[in-house]
Design a protein with these regions (language model features):
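Secreted, disulfide-rich extracellular signaling modules
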Residues: 1-62, 74-81, 101-104, 109, ...
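Internal, hydrophobic beta-strand segments that form the core of beta-sheet-rich folds
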Residues: 1, 137-162
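Extracellular Ig-like/FN3 beta-sandwich strand-entry sites
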Residues: 66-68, 98, 129, 140-148
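Short beta-strand elements
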Residues: 21, 153-175
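A short beta-turn/strand-edge loop motif at beta-sheet boundaries
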Residues: 62-67, 77-98
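Aromatic sugar-binding surface patches on proteins
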Residues: 113, 122-144
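Residue-level signal for glycine
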Residues: 110-111, 155
Length: 175
């Protein structure tokens, strides 16, 4: 839209959550806030991406309404190769592909998509591993939400593949 224009382009009506409708009104705002700094972490290689598992590190069952939370996402090889070292392979954190790892959030009861896979849901990385920050303001309290992940490998090539991970990760937003 052109903010400087005086042309009338239509009306916009928005109702409060007290309107007693079946579905609460929504207003969608998105922004790109992904950061990428791997530190000394190693990447999951393309061979690892074909057979990997995703798990959440420190996922709490409940988060307070209007809070801000950091969700840690870890990808690892399903069957790590045998190596002889002082650190077990299960404890070695590797990072997911940059710019092609996304999260999505759904209402666990209705399966309505709250946060779709998009550039505004890119997973970030720091020296401790992958993560995403979530502002829970506007989420309906006393509801459960589920997390799903999409990992793209071979982006913009003939071998591009999308893998979806819906491992049953849920959390509740409480009052």
């Amino acid at each position: 839209t052109d903010e400087g224009s005086v042309d009338k382009l239509g009306n916009f009506s928005f109702f409060s959550s007290d309107s007693h409708t079946k579905y609460p009104p929504t207003l969608e705002t998105v922004w790109y806030d992904s950061k990428w700094d791997t530190g000394s972490l190693d990447p999951l290689t393309s061979a690892n991406l074909e057979d990997m598992v995703i798990y959440m590190k420190g996922l709490r069952p409940e988060y307070k309404e209007n809070s801000k939370a950091k969700f840690r996402v870890v990808g690892k090889e399903r069957f790590p190769s045998t190596t002889y070292s002082t650190t077990p392979a299960d404890l070695t954190i590797k990072y997911l592909p940059s710019g092609s790892s996304f999260y999505s959030i759904k209402d666990a009861e209705t399966n309505d998509v709250i946060v779709p896979f998009s550039t505004s849901s890119l997973i970030s990385c720091d020296s401790s591993g992958n993560y995403f920050n979530l502002d829970l303001e506007g989420y309906q309290p006393e509801r459960y939400y589920s997390l799903e992940f999409r990992i793209q490998s071979g982006s913009n090539t003939v071998d591009e593949t999308d893998q979806y991970f819906d491992e049953g990760f849920t959390f509740k937003v409480s009052i």
